[in-house]
Amino acid sequence: MGRFVAVALLVLLSLSGLETIQHAPKIQVYSRHPAENGKPNFLNCYVSGFHPSDIEVDLLKNGKKIEKVEHSDLSFSKDWSFYLLYYTEFTPNEKDEYACRVSHVTFSTPKTVKWDRNM
């Protein structure tokens, strides 16, 4: 019985330690297909490698939040870091700028990554 209690305590201590670990998210912004002006596409923001799981992600058009955005379920990797995909339909053109803005405890201010149509 004592051995079980010791093992259970060790597991609980290990899990509680995960909350103190913080990893900044890696942010990747890309389109599903190569960009062509006037041709519908999907804008993706893949956020990965972050911990803890609390995060806010916005897709932006000319600095303003895009309202019709979908996202995957929050998932985690084998190292217990988390990842998400946010995406929306869009039609690229020469004048509009697109970006992904992420707020996470590891950032003092939200981080914005612009979409590069050549990537």
Swiss-Prot record:
One of its GO terms (cellular component) is extracellular region. Coiled coil: none annotated. Residues 1-20 form the signal peptide. GO terms for biological process: antigen processing and presentation of peptide antigen via MHC class I; immune response. It comes from the Eukaryota. It is found in: Secreted. Transmembrane segments: none annotated. Disulfide bonds join C45-C100. Keywords: Disulfide bond, Immunity, Immunoglobulin domain, MHC I, Secreted, Signal. Heterodimer of an alpha chain and a beta chain. Beta-2-microglobulin is the beta-chain of major histocompatibility complex class I molecules. Component of the class I major histocompatibility complex (MHC). Involved in the presentation of peptide antigens to the immune system. This is Beta-2-microglobulin.
